[in-house]
């Protein structure tokens, strides 16, 4: 059977690294008594559009917890330069077809709506010329806009397809009139968008990605998606269909989630 006639399968992969500079042992830290990675995996199970789901980790303790809970675990190397490189290893281990789609679900977002996972997958399916898809949301306040930890994205409409032009930790786009004025800045520009770290990839891209050296802008910004743009790939992008609740980066984030009602994690 030719590849054009073969069905396209969708795989959800949850990368889970134990090492974190801001919050050590993050995947195994508990929310209402359950390791965070298991909350995330249970959310992934609600995404009924996917053919399968697995957790990718380089740590035996994470693998043990996930396997004992009944989840598929793939052990990966510990020396990957980025999460995308790790997904490429998973795709190779699993032997997924080049035309299949991989959805990267962050392991520190236990409240992510499954709707967003489906949206990013559908976005890639609908743009045959893009090798990757992601989501964004408007930035309303100026402090968020200028913060380096918030990744900004600018995009353009090409042939009725919205595609990313550039991602940056810098405040882009720049409103020239505001920058040159003496007034205090209180809000972000109208076209300011925050990039959400949710991706869908074609396996064929992952196969190429690992053979590309890290690019100058990728290294400068520490943003792996720039490697795709610098190598001429198109990244489809759309405004998220619903809000993405904040994930867990710090102990304060973890405390906030533990203070929430248990039903917030159990609802569809």
Curated annotation (Swiss-Prot):
NCBIfam families: kdsB, PRK05450.1-5, PRK13368.1. One of its GO terms (molecular function) is 3-deoxy-manno-octulosonate cytidylyltransferase activity. Pfam families: CTP_transf_3 (PF02348). Keywords: Cytoplasm, Lipopolysaccharide biosynthesis, Nucleotidyltransferase, Transferase. It comes from Psychrobacter arcticus (strain DSM 17307 / VKM B-2377 / 273-4). It catalyses: 3-deoxy-alpha-D-manno-oct-2-ulosonate + CTP = CMP-3-deoxy-beta-D-manno-octulosonate + diphosphate. GO terms for biological process: CMP-keto-3-deoxy-D-manno-octulosonic acid biosynthetic process; lipopolysaccharide biosynthetic process. This is 3-deoxy-manno-octulosonate cytidylyltransferase. Belongs to the KdsB family. Its main location: cytoplasm. It comes from the Bacteria. Pathway: Nucleotide-sugar biosynthesis; CMP-3-deoxy-D-manno-octulosonate biosynthesis; CMP-3-deoxy-D-manno-octulosonate from 3-deoxy-D-manno-octulosonate and CTP: step 1/1; Bacterial outer membrane biogenesis; lipopolysaccharide biosynthesis. One of its GO terms (cellular component) is cytosol. It is found in: Cytoplasm. Its EC number is 2.7.7.38. The gene is kdsB. Activates KDO (a required 8-carbon sugar) for incorporation into bacterial lipopolysaccharide in Gram-negative bacteria.
């Amino acid at each position: 059977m030719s590849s054009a006639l073969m069905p396209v399968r969708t795989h959800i992969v949850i990368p889970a690294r134990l090492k974190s500079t801001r919050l050590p042992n993050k995947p195994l830290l508990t929310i209402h008594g359950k390791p965070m990675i298991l909350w995330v995996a249970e959310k992934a199970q609600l995404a009924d559009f996917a053919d399968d789901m697995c957790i990718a980790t380089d740590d035996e303790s994470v693998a043990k917890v996930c396997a004992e809970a009944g989840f598929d675990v793939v052990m990966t190397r510990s020396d990957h330069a980025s999460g995308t490189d790790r997904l490429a290893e998973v795709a190779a281990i699993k032997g997924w077809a080049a035309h299949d789609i991989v959805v990267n679900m962050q392991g520190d977002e236990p409240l992510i709506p499954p709707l967003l996972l489906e949206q990013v997958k559908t976005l890639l399916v609908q743009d045959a010329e893009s090798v990757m898809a992601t989501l964004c949301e408007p930035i309303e306040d100026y402090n968020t806009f200028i913060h380096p930890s918030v990744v900004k994205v600018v995009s353009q409409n090409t042939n009725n397809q919205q595609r990313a032009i550039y991602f940056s930790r810098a405040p882009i786009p720049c409103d020239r009139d505001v920058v040159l004025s003496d007034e205090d800045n209180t809000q972000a520009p109208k076209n300011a968008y925050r990039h959400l770290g949710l991706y869908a990839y074609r396996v064929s891209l992952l196969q190429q990605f690992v053979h590309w050296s890290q690019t100058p802008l990728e290294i400068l910004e520490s943003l792996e998606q720039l490697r795709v743009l610098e190598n001429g790939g198109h990244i489809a992008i759309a405004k998220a269909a619903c809000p993405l609740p904040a994930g867990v980066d710090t102990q304060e984030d973890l405390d906030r989630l533990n203070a929430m009602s248990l039903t917030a994690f159990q609802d569809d």
